[in-house]
Regions:
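Catalytic cores of RNA-modifying enzymes
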Residues: 1, 48-53, 71, 77
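N-terminal Rossmann-like dinucleotide-binding module
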Residues: 1-39
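Short beta->alpha connector loops
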Residues: 8-11, 61-64, 83-85
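Short, structured coil segments at secondary-structure junctions
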Residues: 21-22, 53, 94-95
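Hydrophobic beta-strand scaffold residues
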Residues: 25, 56-57, 98, 126
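N-terminal beta-loop-helix "entrance" segment that forms/cooperates
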Residues: 34-53
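Short amphipathic alpha-helix with an adjacent loop that forms part of the alpha/beta core around
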Residues: 64-74
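Donor/substrate-binding cores of folate-linked one-carbon enzymes
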Residues: 77-165
Length: 165
């Protein structure tokens, strides 16, 4: 089975590693590297991992105009984890199955920054959801959920680490 993986932050790295151990990851798509200081760029965590694993890496500003390039990999499955961009339906339709690993217990905290919003709202529990992707954001069939306790000392980074394992 050939997979295209889309992700950007540390949260997504263990997911990419696990997929790479069991399947053929044809392409990794991550957000473009951003400037840390003037003229200096740092790889996104997923980009750094993809490079270290010797995987094909693509970092477009947006993916919507890269349909033909993505299609050329002839992958069966798309897996996303904190990619940071909406994936157009035209691209979703290239795959037999599209899965998203989302950093909340859906349907709560759909969309971006779910971990940060859980902390801001004083939640004691959050989690991760594996779901089917549809054209509506974070609204597909949910296949699995795992809870995670939020302690008073937890930062967003701590929770990212707990959820990405």
């Amino acid at each position: 089975m050939k997979i295209i993986f889309m992700g950007t932050p540390d949260f997504a790295c263990p997911i990419l590693e696990a997929l790479n151990e069991k399947y053929e990851v044809s392409l990794v798509i991550s957000q473009p590297n951003r400037s840390k200081k003037k003229g200096q760029y740092i790889d996104t965590p997923v980009a750094a991992l993809a490079k270290s694993l010797g995987l094909n890496l693509f970092q477009p500003e947006t993916i919507k105009e890269h349909f033909d390039y993505i299609k050329s990999f002839e992958a069966d499955v798309l897996v996303t984890a904190a990619y940071g961009q909406y994936v157009p339906t035209k691209i979703l339709n290239l795959f037999k199955k599209c899965l998203n690993v989302h950093g909340s217990l859906l349907p709560k905290y759909r969309g971006g920054a779910p971990i940060q919003r859980a902390i801001i709202n004083g939640e004691n529990v959050t989690g991760v959801t594996i779901m089917e992707m549809t054209k509506k954001l974070d609204a597909g069939v949910m296949y699995a959920k795992k809870e995670c306790i939020i302690t008073n000392d937890d930062t967003a980074s701590d929770i990212f680490s707990k959820l990405s394992i």
